[in-house]
Amino acid sequence: MDINASRALANVYDLPDDFFPKIDDLVRDAKDALEPYWKSDSIKKHVLIATHFVDLIEDFWQTTQGMHEIAESLRAVIPPTTTPVPPGYLIQHEEAEEIPLGDLFKHQEERIVSFQPDYPITARIHAHLKAYAKINEESLDRARRLLWWHYNCLLWGEAQVTNYISRLRTWLSTPEKYRGRDAPTIEAITRPIQVAQGGRKTTTGTRKPRGLEPRRRKVKTTVVYGRRRSKSRERRAPTPQRAGSPLPRSSSSHHRSPSPRK
């Protein structure tokens, strides 16, 4: 990956959240893009990485949805006077990356106890589920951005996606009154290139290389009395002749008759 593509991939994380499709739509679109490569057993870089994220997102998404459903069902058995655990006592995604997976429950339980030692057991389970679901959602957000990048590179080409991210970020960073109303789309960027490639005529045979032979000078021609005469041809000087006079004689026949006086 060149430096421009690497920079564009890093900029994907700064794009607005609503720019990316929802998880269900994203996975469906990615599978449609990957299906031809799966059938041909392609081992391209973008195919392998996108396939990994499709499997990862599907598993994480189903697990996260299950956590939310269980947490919502526990609300009915939590005592109504229970104070919810403040967000500051819940483990965040950045902290979870530094904690071993087996110790995650222990660290979260210690924080709940520090907030309220006699916290109800149902409320504790609810707090654990909400914390884990949020960690999964933040992990899913990073994964879906990477999945979007890799399967769009398969659809449009890495160079086109890199160019599109650059233009989109420029549009987003430009004040509203100085930019166009609509954000650029990757379809609009790639369409002129596709039309130009499709409309190009193909020629058979080998082309003669230019510059190897001197160019021949074209001879200009003019039309004189219905005849075409080359300008490069030497012209004879016109013989002076008065109107109505006979044709001039040649120099050999130009001699005077003897004078009758002699």
Curated annotation (Swiss-Prot):
Which GO biological process annotations does it have?
microtubule-dependent intracellular transport of viral material towards nucleus; symbiont entry into host cell; viral penetration into host nucleus
Give the residue ranges for region: RNA binding: 254-260
One annotated GO molecular function is: DNA binding
> Where in this protein would one find the motif Bipartite nuclear localization signal, according to its record?
215-233
Functional description taken from the UniProt entry: Self assembles to form an icosahedral capsid. Most capsid appear to be large particles with an icosahedral symmetry of T=4 and consist of 240 copies of capsid protein, though a fraction forms smaller T=3 particles consisting of 180 capsid proteins. Entering capsid are transported along microtubules to the nucleus. Phosphorylation of the capsid is thought to induce exposure of nuclear localization signal in the C-terminal portion of the capsid protein that allows binding to the nuclear pore complex via the importin (karyopherin-) alpha and beta.
Q: Report quaternary structure and partners.
A: Homodimerizes, then multimerizes.
Give the protein's recorded name: Capsid protein
The gene that this protein is the product of is: C
